UniProtKB/Swiss-Prot annotation:
Keywords in alphabetical order: Ribonucleoprotein, Ribosomal protein
GO CC aspect terms: ribonucleoprotein complex; ribosome
GO biological processes: translation
Protein name: Small ribosomal subunit protein eS6
PANTHER family: 40S RIBOSOMAL PROTEIN S6
Taxonomic source organism: Nanoarchaeum equitans (strain Kin4-M)
Gene Ontology MF: a single term: structural constituent of ribosome
Keyword Iron-sulfur: no
Family according to the record: Belongs to the eukaryotic ribosomal protein eS6 family.
Amino acid sequence: MPKASVVKIVVSDPKSGKAIQIETKEPQWLYGKKIGDTIDGSKIGLDGYELKITGGSDIAGFPMRKEVEGAVRKKIWWWVDKRMRVKKTVYGNTISDEIVQVNTVIVKYGEKPFEEIYNEFKSNKQ
């Protein structure tokens, strides 16, 4: 199975609803972390920020689920509505070398306002 060499970390601000996407080429420090764990934002250039992992997706595009333990793919029953459910493949709640995207939300803000960081990322992107 091919392994992910670059991991995209999506940082969302719950106050403004805005998000930035940061790529890290050395994601080994993330391995073993689970959905719900907090990580230090200084490792991705967000000094003073604390981020909570809320989800992600693996190299094949399967979403991570908090209920599925470990770094594995499983088929689970997914409720579509009250009367119908389907089997869906999902990835477990632990980050491994097969994860390509990690979704996070800010739980503690740093000294630099997120609005300023957001504007810097937008101007660098263009």
